[in-house]
Protein backbone atom coordinates (compact mmCIF):
# COMPACT_ATOMS: atom_id res chain seq x y z
CA UNK A 1 0.00 0.00 0.00
CA UNK A 2 2.84 2.37 0.88
CA UNK A 3 4.50 1.53 -2.43
CA UNK A 4 1.33 2.50 -4.33
CA UNK A 5 1.10 5.80 -2.44
CA UNK A 6 4.77 6.53 -3.15
CA UNK A 7 4.30 5.76 -6.85
CA UNK A 8 1.32 8.10 -6.97
CA UNK A 9 3.27 10.88 -5.29
CA UNK A 10 6.10 10.47 -7.76
CA UNK A 11 3.59 10.54 -10.59
CA UNK A 12 2.10 13.80 -9.31
CA UNK A 13 5.55 15.35 -8.89
CA UNK A 14 6.57 14.26 -12.39
CA UNK A 15 3.37 15.72 -13.85
CA UNK A 16 3.94 18.99 -11.98
CA UNK A 17 7.52 19.24 -13.24
CA UNK A 18 6.28 18.52 -16.77
CA UNK A 19 3.72 21.34 -16.53
CA UNK A 20 6.23 23.82 -15.09
CA UNK A 21 8.85 22.98 -17.70
CA UNK A 22 6.42 23.42 -20.59
CA UNK A 23 5.09 26.72 -19.23
CA UNK A 24 8.66 28.01 -18.90
CA UNK A 25 9.54 26.78 -22.38
CA UNK A 26 6.47 28.40 -23.98
CA UNK A 27 7.17 31.64 -22.11
CA UNK A 28 10.81 31.61 -23.19
CA UNK A 29 9.89 31.05 -26.84
CA UNK A 30 7.47 33.98 -26.81
CA UNK A 31 9.92 36.15 -24.86
CA UNK A 32 12.58 35.67 -27.54
CA UNK A 33 10.18 37.13 -30.13
CA UNK A 34 9.85 40.21 -27.92
CA UNK A 35 13.51 40.59 -26.95
CA UNK A 36 14.97 40.20 -30.45
CA UNK A 37 14.09 41.87 -33.72
CA UNK A 38 14.89 38.65 -35.53
CA UNK A 39 12.50 35.70 -35.51
CA UNK A 40 15.31 33.15 -35.66
CA UNK A 41 16.23 32.85 -31.94
CA UNK A 42 12.68 31.72 -31.11
CA UNK A 43 12.56 29.38 -34.11
CA UNK A 44 15.90 27.81 -33.15
CA UNK A 45 14.65 27.26 -29.58
CA UNK A 46 11.52 25.48 -30.85
CA UNK A 47 13.62 23.32 -33.18
CA UNK A 48 16.08 22.44 -30.39
CA UNK A 49 13.16 21.33 -28.22
CA UNK A 50 12.74 18.40 -30.62
CA UNK A 51 16.18 16.99 -29.79
CA UNK A 52 14.63 13.66 -28.83
CA UNK A 53 13.93 13.03 -32.51
CA UNK A 54 17.64 12.26 -32.87
CA UNK A 55 18.00 10.45 -29.53
CA UNK A 56 17.46 7.08 -31.21
CA UNK A 57 19.17 5.01 -33.87
CA UNK A 58 19.53 6.83 -37.20
CA UNK A 59 17.13 4.46 -38.94
CA UNK A 60 14.31 5.87 -36.78
CA UNK A 61 15.14 9.54 -37.43
CA UNK A 62 12.87 9.87 -40.45
CA UNK A 63 9.85 8.35 -38.71
CA UNK A 64 10.42 10.43 -35.58
CA UNK A 65 10.84 13.61 -37.60
CA UNK A 66 7.64 13.06 -39.58
CA UNK A 67 5.62 12.29 -36.45
CA UNK A 68 7.01 15.40 -34.71
CA UNK A 69 6.47 17.70 -37.69
CA UNK A 70 2.91 18.90 -36.81
CA UNK A 71 4.04 19.89 -33.31
CA UNK A 72 7.08 21.64 -34.77
CA UNK A 73 4.91 23.51 -37.27
CA UNK A 74 2.49 24.60 -34.55
CA UNK A 75 5.31 25.86 -32.32
CA UNK A 76 7.11 27.74 -35.10
CA UNK A 77 3.77 29.11 -36.27
CA UNK A 78 2.87 30.54 -32.87
CA UNK A 79 6.24 32.20 -32.29
CA UNK A 80 6.02 33.63 -35.81
CA UNK A 81 2.61 35.09 -35.00
CA UNK A 82 4.02 36.55 -31.76
CA UNK A 83 6.94 38.06 -33.65
CA UNK A 84 4.53 39.47 -36.23
CA UNK A 85 2.46 41.12 -33.49
CA UNK A 86 5.55 42.94 -32.32
CA UNK A 87 6.44 44.12 -35.81
CA UNK A 88 2.90 45.36 -36.48
CA UNK A 89 2.92 47.10 -33.09
CA UNK A 90 6.13 48.92 -34.03
CA UNK A 91 4.56 50.07 -37.31
CA UNK A 92 1.69 51.61 -35.34
CA UNK A 93 4.14 53.48 -33.10
CA UNK A 94 6.19 54.71 -36.07
CA UNK A 95 3.01 56.03 -37.66
CA UNK A 96 2.13 57.80 -34.42
CA UNK A 97 -1.06 55.79 -33.95
CA UNK A 98 -2.35 54.20 -30.77
CA UNK A 99 -2.49 50.41 -30.67
CA UNK A 100 -6.11 49.15 -30.54
CA UNK A 101 -4.88 46.16 -28.51
CA UNK A 102 -1.59 46.02 -26.56
CA UNK A 103 0.87 43.85 -28.48
CA UNK A 104 2.18 42.35 -25.24
CA UNK A 105 -1.32 41.17 -24.27
CA UNK A 106 -1.70 39.34 -27.58
CA UNK A 107 1.76 37.82 -27.27
CA UNK A 108 1.04 36.60 -23.74
CA UNK A 109 -2.20 35.07 -25.02
CA UNK A 110 -0.22 33.21 -27.68
CA UNK A 111 2.13 31.98 -24.95
CA UNK A 112 -0.85 30.66 -22.98
CA UNK A 113 -2.15 28.89 -26.09
CA UNK A 114 1.27 27.32 -26.66
CA UNK A 115 1.38 26.14 -23.04
CA UNK A 116 -2.06 24.57 -23.35
CA UNK A 117 -0.96 22.88 -26.56
CA UNK A 118 2.10 21.36 -24.90
CA UNK A 119 0.42 20.38 -21.63
CA UNK A 120 -3.17 19.48 -22.55
CA UNK A 121 -3.59 18.96 -26.29
CA UNK A 122 -0.36 17.41 -27.56
CA UNK A 123 -0.28 14.44 -25.09
CA UNK A 124 -3.80 13.29 -26.05
CA UNK A 125 -4.12 10.40 -28.50
CA UNK A 126 -7.87 10.03 -29.04
CA UNK A 127 -9.29 10.28 -32.55
CA UNK A 128 -10.88 13.67 -31.95
CA UNK A 129 -7.73 15.14 -30.38
CA UNK A 130 -5.39 13.84 -33.08
CA UNK A 131 -7.71 15.28 -35.71
CA UNK A 132 -7.75 18.58 -33.85
CA UNK A 133 -3.95 18.59 -33.58
CA UNK A 134 -3.61 18.05 -37.32
CA UNK A 135 -6.15 20.78 -38.08
CA UNK A 136 -4.61 23.24 -35.62
CA UNK A 137 -1.06 22.74 -36.90
CA UNK A 138 -2.21 23.30 -40.47
CA UNK A 139 -4.22 26.41 -39.56
CA UNK A 140 -1.47 28.02 -37.47
CA UNK A 141 1.17 27.04 -40.02
CA UNK A 142 -0.70 28.67 -42.92
CA UNK A 143 -1.43 31.83 -40.90
CA UNK A 144 2.26 32.13 -39.99
CA UNK A 145 3.38 31.39 -43.55
CA UNK A 146 1.36 34.26 -44.98
CA UNK A 147 2.68 36.53 -42.23
CA UNK A 148 6.24 36.14 -43.49
CA UNK A 149 5.40 35.60 -47.17
CA UNK A 150 6.26 39.14 -48.20
CA UNK A 151 9.70 39.12 -49.75
CA UNK A 152 9.85 35.31 -49.73
CA UNK A 153 10.57 33.57 -53.06
CA UNK A 154 7.47 31.93 -54.48
CA UNK A 155 9.18 28.54 -54.68
CA UNK A 156 10.06 28.59 -50.97
CA UNK A 157 6.52 29.71 -50.13
CA UNK A 158 4.99 26.81 -52.05
CA UNK A 159 7.39 24.22 -50.60
CA UNK A 160 6.56 25.32 -47.05
CA UNK A 161 2.83 25.22 -47.86
CA UNK A 162 3.28 21.65 -49.11
CA UNK A 163 5.18 20.59 -45.97
CA UNK A 164 2.50 22.06 -43.68
CA UNK A 165 -0.33 20.29 -45.51
CA UNK A 166 1.59 17.02 -45.89
CA UNK A 167 2.38 16.87 -42.17
CA UNK A 168 -1.21 17.62 -41.20
CA UNK A 169 -2.69 15.00 -43.53
CA UNK A 170 -0.16 12.38 -42.50
CA UNK A 171 -0.99 12.86 -38.84
CA UNK A 172 -4.74 12.63 -39.46
CA UNK A 173 -4.37 9.51 -41.62
CA UNK A 174 -2.10 7.93 -39.02
CA UNK A 175 -5.17 6.97 -36.96
CA UNK A 176 -6.22 4.50 -39.64
CA UNK A 177 -4.54 1.45 -41.14
CA UNK A 178 -3.99 3.24 -44.42
CA UNK A 179 -1.41 1.62 -46.68
CA UNK A 180 -1.33 4.67 -48.97
CA UNK A 181 -0.83 7.15 -46.14
CA UNK A 182 2.18 8.80 -47.77
CA UNK A 183 0.52 8.99 -51.18
CA UNK A 184 -2.69 10.54 -49.85
CA UNK A 185 -0.75 13.03 -47.73
CA UNK A 186 1.30 13.97 -50.80
CA UNK A 187 -1.85 14.50 -52.86
CA UNK A 188 -3.28 16.76 -50.17
CA UNK A 189 0.01 18.65 -50.00
CA UNK A 190 0.00 19.23 -53.76
CA UNK A 191 -3.62 20.42 -53.66
CA UNK A 192 -2.83 22.89 -50.89
CA UNK A 193 0.26 24.02 -52.78
CA UNK A 194 -1.88 24.84 -55.82
CA UNK A 195 -4.37 26.78 -53.68
CA UNK A 196 -1.46 28.59 -52.03
CA UNK A 197 -0.18 29.57 -55.48
CA UNK A 198 -3.53 31.20 -56.23
CA UNK A 199 -3.57 32.91 -52.83
CA UNK A 200 -0.06 34.21 -53.43
CA UNK A 201 -1.44 36.35 -56.25
CA UNK A 202 -4.85 37.08 -54.71
CA UNK A 203 -4.96 37.21 -50.92
CA UNK A 204 -7.84 38.09 -48.63
CA UNK A 205 -7.29 38.55 -44.90
CA UNK A 206 -9.55 38.80 -41.87
CA UNK A 207 -8.59 40.49 -38.60
CA UNK A 208 -8.77 38.18 -35.60
CA UNK A 209 -7.30 41.14 -33.70
CA UNK A 210 -5.74 44.29 -35.18
CA UNK A 211 -2.39 42.53 -34.72
CA UNK A 212 -3.25 39.10 -36.18
CA UNK A 213 -4.41 38.64 -39.76
CA UNK A 214 -6.06 35.39 -40.77
CA UNK A 215 -5.65 34.54 -44.49
CA UNK A 216 -8.79 33.33 -46.20
CA UNK A 217 -6.91 30.25 -47.39
CA UNK A 218 -6.43 29.06 -43.77
CA UNK A 219 -10.19 29.11 -43.22
CA UNK A 220 -10.98 27.44 -46.55
CA UNK A 221 -8.42 24.70 -45.94
CA UNK A 222 -9.85 24.05 -42.47
CA UNK A 223 -13.36 23.58 -43.88
CA UNK A 224 -12.13 21.31 -46.67
CA UNK A 225 -9.98 19.33 -44.23
CA UNK A 226 -12.84 18.66 -41.82
CA UNK A 227 -15.12 17.56 -44.66
CA UNK A 228 -12.45 15.37 -46.27
CA UNK A 229 -11.64 13.74 -42.92
CA UNK A 230 -15.29 12.88 -42.27
CA UNK A 231 -15.67 11.45 -45.77
CA UNK A 232 -12.54 9.36 -45.33
CA UNK A 233 -13.58 8.10 -41.90
CA UNK A 234 -17.07 7.17 -43.14
CA UNK A 235 -15.55 5.31 -46.10
CA UNK A 236 -13.17 3.45 -43.81
CA UNK A 237 -16.05 2.32 -41.59
CA UNK A 238 -18.33 0.69 -44.16
CA UNK A 239 -17.15 1.72 -47.63
CA UNK A 240 -20.08 4.12 -48.01
CA UNK A 241 -20.69 7.78 -47.22
CA UNK A 242 -24.02 9.23 -46.10
CA UNK A 243 -25.08 12.77 -45.23
CA UNK A 244 -25.68 11.70 -41.63
CA UNK A 245 -22.04 10.65 -41.30
CA UNK A 246 -20.90 14.04 -42.56
CA UNK A 247 -23.05 15.95 -40.08
What are these regions, as identified by a protein language model?
Residues 13-14, 18, 62-74, 120-140, ...:
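Cytoplasm-facing juxtamembrane segments at the starts of transmembrane helices
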Residues 49-65, 113-126, 166-180, 227-239:
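C-terminal ends of transmembrane helices
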Residues 39-49, 103-110, 155-166, 213-223:
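Hydrophobic core segments of alpha-helical transmembrane domains in multi-pass membrane proteins
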Residues 85-95, 105-150, 165-175:
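Internal transmembrane alpha-helix with an interfacial aromatic "cap," most often the third helix
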Residues 2-34, 180, 184-186, 195-247:
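C-terminal transmembrane helix-loop-helix hairpin of multi-pass membrane proteins
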Residues 21-29, 77-83, 137-146, 163-170, ...:
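Hydrophobic, membrane-inserted alpha-helices
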Residues 1-120, 241-247:
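N-terminal topogenic module of multi-pass integral membrane proteins
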Residues 81-91, 141-153, 193-208:
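Hydrophobic alpha-helical transmembrane segments in multi-pass integral membrane proteins
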